[in-house]
Design a protein with these regions (language model features):
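Carbohydrate-binding surfaces of carbohydrate-active enzymes
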Residues: 245
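Polysaccharide-binding surfaces and accessory modules of carbohydrate-active proteins
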Residues: 1-242
Length: 245
């Protein structure tokens, strides 16, 4: 597995995951907006634009002001961890991505610390936010993404559900900057209820598949999110996956 970090002209930092055997197929210049590593919302924050209310709290006013402060790699516990730091006002965020020897998966979490004397109410904090899920070509490739989910009412008993992104309405809109989000995950106090906290993404043409799940002893959800970047040149889009408990 290969991970690449990117920083745009606005100082936002994001990353891309691909199989190591496919890293040379990543397009050098993305035609989509960089997905920030940190997604959070404070009480009183502005919502992220048209029709976002009720769909998502991501891309809040605080996220737009967060700045990158540093990155380091730490080798410990039989693996290595990449810590990327950010700050806004008196809040400090650390995005931790950990690789363990012998595993073809990585663990991701985000921590936040209030270093000021003013109380801040954190309404939402994503454990991870991963965009650019198919970084192998530019533009829109219709009916090329299969999304896998696992409906369940108890424990690990579930069936596998497969749908195209278009079937879940994760498609571009004719309204510039419109936001659309599909969420699922754990609700209530049962081990699982409604959906196992898992999602798989398959690039049909490239025969590449990745899966994501969260581990938290509380209700939480995974969100699939799409937002176009504008009509100035071509309409371009990517699906983003986020999780929080």
């Amino acid at each position: 597995m290969t991970v690449r970090y990117y920083k745009d002209d606005m100082g936002k930092v994001g990353f891309v995951f691909v199989p190591t055997s496919m890293k040379k197929q990543i397009v050098p210049e993305f035609d989509c907006r960089l997905e920030p590593l940190i997604q959070c919302k404070l009480v009183g924050d502005a919502y992220p634009g048209p029709f976002a209310c009720g769909h998502t709290m991501r891309d809040s006013g605080t996220v737009k002001r967060i700045s990158f402060t540093g990155q380091e790699e730490i080798r410990a516990d039989g693996g290595r961890r990449i810590e990327t730091s950010f700050a806004v006002d008196e809040l400090s965020f650390v995005h931790k991505l950990t690789f363990f020897e012998g595993y073809d998966a990585a663990e991701c979490c985000v921590s936040v610390e209030n270093k000021g004397g003013v109380t801040v109410s954190l309404e939402m904090l994503h454990s991870f936010s991963l965009g650019m899920l198919t970084p192998f070509e530019n533009g829109i490739h219709k009916e090329n993404l299969n999304l896998y989910r696992m409906p369940s009412r108890w424990a690990s008993e579930a069936h596998l559900e497969k749908k195209l992104a278009e079937e879940l309405l994760l498609v571009p809109s004719f309204l510039e900057e419109e936001i659309f989000c599909v969420s699922h995950g754990q609700i209530g106090s049962k081990p699982t209820d409604h959906y196992i906290p898992f999602v798989g993404i398959e690039d049909i043409e490239k025969k590449c598949c990745g899966a994501h799940r969260y581990h938290v002893q509380a209700p939480g959800k995974l969100s699939l999110f799409v937002r176009i970047t504008g009509f100035q040149s071509a309409v371009v889009w990517r699906i983003t996956i986020t999780a929080h408990g």
